[in-house]
Amino acid sequence: MSATAATAPPAAPAGEGGPPAPPPNLTSNRRLQQTQAQVDEVVDIMRVNVDKVLERDQKLSELDDRADALQAGASQFETSAAKLKRKYWWKNLKMMIILGVICAIILIIIIVYFSS
């Protein structure tokens, strides 16, 4: 036997023309790596989703605070508007009473002047 014949790789089995099939352990490792990559991708997506939910919650909280402040301001405005309306109603009533008294005095003067 020659030295080159002893170190040559074994020939492929008869009937198979392609490369030898990978060992089952290598295939399961590849599947495990693919599955792990998918899991990592899902974890990254879920982290982004959780961050978005937390950001949305913060924005909703700020919006709720602003709505409460706006409601308080609206209530205060309504109270102030009612007081102002009442104030000007009384002022208008006083003006009408004064105008009525002046008209009555003028009418009395005219009646007294022309009746004599």
Swiss-Prot record:
Q: Which GO terms describe its cellular component?
A: caveola; lysosomal membrane; plasma membrane; SNARE complex; synaptic vesicle membrane; vesicle
The role this protein plays is:
Involved in the targeting and/or fusion of transport vesicles to their target membrane. Major SNARE protein of synaptic vesicles which mediates fusion of synaptic vesicles to release neurotransmitters. Essential for fast vesicular exocytosis and activity-dependent neurotransmitter release as well as fast endocytosis that mediates rapid reuse of synaptic vesicles. Modulates the gating characteristics of the delayed rectifier voltage-dependent potassium channel KCNB1.
Q: Where in the cell is it found?
A: Cytoplasmic vesicle, Secretory vesicle, Synaptic vesicle membrane; Cell membrane
**Pfam families with a match to the protein in the record:** Synaptobrevin (PF00957)
Oligomer status and interactors = Part of the SNARE core complex containing SNAP25, VAMP2 and STX1A; this complex constitutes the basic catalytic machinery of the complex neurotransmitter release apparatus. Recruited to the SNARE complex following binding of the SNARE complex component STX1A to STXBP1. This complex binds to CPLX1. Interacts with POPDC1 and STX4. Interacts with VAPA and VAPB. Interacts with WDFY2, PRKCZ and PRKCI. Forms a complex with WDFY2 and PRKCZ. Interacts (via N-terminus) with KCNB1 (via N-terminus and C-terminus); stimulates the channel inactivation rate of KCNB1.
Post-translational modification comment from the UniProt entry: Phosphorylated by PRKCZ in vitro and this phosphorylation is increased in the presence of WDFY2.
UniProt KW keywords: Acetylation, Cell membrane, Coiled coil, Cytoplasmic vesicle, Membrane, Phosphoprotein, Synapse, Transmembrane, Transmembrane helix
Q: What is this protein called?
A: Vesicle-associated membrane protein 2
Cytoplasmic domain ranges by topology? 2-94
User: What positions are modified (N-acetylserine)?
Assistant: 2
GO MF terms, alphabetically ordered: SNAP receptor activity; syntaxin binding; syntaxin-1 binding
**What membrane topology is annotated for this entry?**
Single-pass type IV membrane protein
CDD domains according to UniProt: R-SNARE_VAMP2 (cd15870)
Asked if the Swiss-Prot or TrEMBL record annotates the protein with the keyword Transmembrane, the reply is yes
| Every v-SNARE coiled-coil homology domain range | 31-91
Protein family per UniProt: Belongs to the synaptobrevin family.
Spans annotated as Required for interaction with SEPT8: 92-116
